Protein backbone atom coordinates (compact mmCIF):
# COMPACT_ATOMS: atom_id res chain seq x y z
CA UNK A 1 0.00 0.00 0.00
CA UNK A 2 1.59 3.23 -1.16
CA UNK A 3 0.85 6.37 0.81
CA UNK A 4 0.76 10.02 -0.24
CA UNK A 5 1.59 9.79 -3.94
CA UNK A 6 0.75 13.48 -4.35
CA UNK A 7 2.64 13.50 -7.63
CA UNK A 8 0.11 10.98 -9.02
CA UNK A 9 -3.22 12.58 -8.13
CA UNK A 10 -4.40 15.40 -5.89
CA UNK A 11 -7.61 16.52 -4.28
CA UNK A 12 -8.49 20.08 -3.34
CA UNK A 13 -9.21 21.50 0.09
CA UNK A 14 -12.85 21.82 -0.97
CA UNK A 15 -13.01 18.08 -1.78
CA UNK A 16 -11.22 17.19 1.46
CA UNK A 17 -13.64 19.26 3.54
CA UNK A 18 -16.68 17.67 1.87
CA UNK A 19 -15.26 14.17 2.33
CA UNK A 20 -14.62 14.95 6.01
CA UNK A 21 -18.20 16.20 6.38
CA UNK A 22 -19.69 13.06 4.80
CA UNK A 23 -17.54 10.78 6.95
CA UNK A 24 -18.72 12.64 10.04
CA UNK A 25 -22.36 12.13 8.94
CA UNK A 26 -21.71 8.40 8.47
CA UNK A 27 -20.32 8.20 12.03
CA UNK A 28 -17.65 5.77 10.88
CA UNK A 29 -14.07 7.02 11.01
CA UNK A 30 -12.87 3.95 9.11
CA UNK A 31 -14.51 4.86 5.79
CA UNK A 32 -12.50 6.50 3.05
CA UNK A 33 -13.53 7.88 -0.32
CA UNK A 34 -12.56 5.52 -3.12
CA UNK A 35 -12.43 6.70 -6.72
CA UNK A 36 -12.28 4.12 -9.47
CA UNK A 37 -12.86 3.78 -13.19
CA UNK A 38 -15.40 1.50 -14.86
CA UNK A 39 -16.31 0.95 -18.48
CA UNK A 40 -19.46 2.78 -19.55
CA UNK A 41 -20.98 6.13 -20.28
CA UNK A 42 -21.15 7.83 -23.63
CA UNK A 43 -17.36 8.19 -23.91
CA UNK A 44 -16.20 4.73 -22.78
CA UNK A 45 -15.07 5.15 -19.16
CA UNK A 46 -16.81 6.52 -16.07
CA UNK A 47 -15.63 7.86 -12.73
CA UNK A 48 -17.17 6.19 -9.69
CA UNK A 49 -17.02 7.31 -6.06
CA UNK A 50 -17.90 5.15 -3.05
CA UNK A 51 -17.19 5.29 0.65
CA UNK A 52 -15.30 2.13 1.53
CA UNK A 53 -13.84 0.63 4.71
CA UNK A 54 -11.70 -1.92 2.91
CA UNK A 55 -8.22 -1.00 1.77
CA UNK A 56 -6.49 -3.52 -0.44
CA UNK A 57 -2.78 -4.20 -0.21
CA UNK A 58 -2.10 -2.63 -3.62
CA UNK A 59 -4.32 0.45 -3.10
CA UNK A 60 -2.76 3.90 -3.20
CA UNK A 61 -3.68 6.34 -0.41
CA UNK A 62 -3.60 10.10 -0.92
CA UNK A 63 -3.86 12.09 2.31
CA UNK A 64 -4.85 15.70 2.85
CA UNK A 65 -6.28 17.45 5.94
CA UNK A 66 -6.43 14.09 7.76
CA UNK A 67 -8.60 12.63 4.97
CA UNK A 68 -7.65 9.66 2.81
CA UNK A 69 -8.57 9.16 -0.84
CA UNK A 70 -8.17 5.54 -2.00
CA UNK A 71 -7.35 4.54 -5.59
CA UNK A 72 -6.60 1.13 -7.03
CA UNK A 73 -3.51 0.89 -9.28
CA UNK A 74 -5.48 0.22 -12.47
CA UNK A 75 -7.71 3.27 -12.00
CA UNK A 76 -4.65 5.36 -11.17
CA UNK A 77 -3.29 4.66 -14.65
CA UNK A 78 -6.28 6.57 -16.05
CA UNK A 79 -6.21 9.31 -13.39
CA UNK A 80 -2.46 9.98 -13.15
CA UNK A 81 -1.82 13.72 -12.80
CA UNK A 82 -5.49 14.50 -12.18
CA UNK A 83 -7.25 16.51 -9.51
CA UNK A 84 -10.46 15.76 -7.59
CA UNK A 85 -12.47 18.85 -6.62
CA UNK A 86 -15.86 19.45 -5.04
CA UNK A 87 -18.18 22.10 -6.44
CA UNK A 88 -21.41 23.58 -5.09
CA UNK A 89 -23.41 25.98 -7.26
CA UNK A 90 -26.95 26.64 -8.47
CA UNK A 91 -26.88 23.46 -10.56
CA UNK A 92 -26.17 21.32 -7.48
CA UNK A 93 -23.13 19.82 -5.85
CA UNK A 94 -20.70 17.18 -7.08
CA UNK A 95 -17.17 15.90 -7.09
CA UNK A 96 -15.37 16.90 -10.29
CA UNK A 97 -12.40 15.14 -11.84
CA UNK A 98 -9.89 17.15 -13.88
CA UNK A 99 -8.15 14.44 -15.86
CA UNK A 100 -5.23 15.41 -18.12
CA UNK A 101 -5.31 11.92 -19.68
CA UNK A 102 -8.86 12.25 -21.02
CA UNK A 103 -8.83 12.97 -24.73
CA UNK A 104 -12.61 13.43 -24.87
CA UNK A 105 -15.27 13.94 -22.22
CA UNK A 106 -19.03 13.92 -22.45
CA UNK A 107 -21.16 16.94 -21.62
CA UNK A 108 -21.96 15.76 -18.10
CA UNK A 109 -18.25 15.34 -17.30
CA UNK A 110 -18.74 11.87 -15.85
CA UNK A 111 -17.43 9.83 -18.75
CA UNK A 112 -14.28 10.13 -20.82
CA UNK A 113 -12.12 8.41 -23.40
CA UNK A 114 -8.37 7.97 -23.60
From Swiss-Prot:
GO terms for molecular function: 2 iron, 2 sulfur cluster binding; 4 iron, 4 sulfur cluster binding; iron ion binding. One of its GO terms (biological process) is iron-sulfur cluster assembly. Pfam families: Fe-S_biosyn (PF01521). InterPro entries: FeS_biogenesis, FeS_cluster_insertion, FeS_cluster_insertion_CS, FeS_cluster_insertion_RrpA, HesB-like_dom_sf. Binds 1 iron-sulfur cluster per subunit. Keywords: Iron, Iron-sulfur, Metal-binding. Gene3D superfamilies: HesB-like domain. The keyword Iron applies. Coiled coil: none annotated. Its cofactor is iron-sulfur cluster. Iron-sulfur cluster binds at residues 42, 106, 108. Belongs to the HesB/IscA family. Required for insertion of 4Fe-4S clusters for at least IspG. Homodimer. This is Iron-sulfur cluster insertion protein ErpA. It comes from Buchnera aphidicola subsp. Schizaphis graminum (strain Sg). The lineage of its organism: Bacteria, Pseudomonadati, Pseudomonadota, Gammaproteobacteria, Enterobacterales.
